[in-house]
Amino acid sequence: LGFTGTYEGRPISVMGSGMGMPSIGIYSYELFKFYDVDNIIRIGSAGSYTADAKLFDTVLATGAVSESNYARVQSGNDHDITFPSEELNDKLRASAKKQGIKLIEGNIHSSDVFYRQPSDAKPTYWELLRDERGCLCVEMESFALFANAEVLGKNAACLLTISDSFVSPEITTAEQRQKSFTDMMKVALGAEY
């Protein structure tokens, strides 16, 4: 489902991308390649890997680390990290600053698995991603989005709101996720691109 219109006089489209890298991979590739879209800003929820990223905080991704083989299969990129457009991230930073919205910046983890089986290994998988790769939180799409943007010479970015945490028992309710995750939207809509 998608909507196209204007926001403060600028054309904008808002749509769902489905869940996971294959889904956003298809949508973003087609929008970039066949519909001449230049900028895609993913917004969504994430689970925090660190006490520094608390419920309702807004995260700006500076890299997406993944165990996915999406980029390797799609374009031969063997790296386990993809990057957003620095130009678009700069515009998001400026928008946040103008609106007084705090951004937490860093790498994120793009996982193929929502329900990973528990392990007795210490440190845990997510602790390794946090401690060795600087991942602040986990989501499921940005690695593929950034890979497509790089291959096609387009711009992509990701803003996330922390909905739950691996280091705290706190969790947002469904109603809070529907009604309170607005800072990331304000930052995305306020960017001048």
Positions of predicted regions on the chain:
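Metabolite-binding pocket within alpha/beta catalytic cores that recognizes anionic/polar moieties
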Residues: 1-91
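A C-terminal functional module that forms or caps the active site or interfaces directly
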Residues: 124-155
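Glycine-rich beta-alpha junction loops
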Residues: 47, 109-115, 144, 162-165
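Active-site rim beta-loop-alpha module in soluble metabolic enzymes
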Residues: 79-132
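Generic non-transmembrane alpha-helical segments
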Residues: 91-99, 148, 187-193
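His/Asp/Glu-rich mid-to-C-terminal helical/loop segments that flank catalytic regions of hydrolases
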Residues: 166-193
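Glycine-rich phosphate/pyrophosphate-binding loops
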Residues: 43-47, 152-167
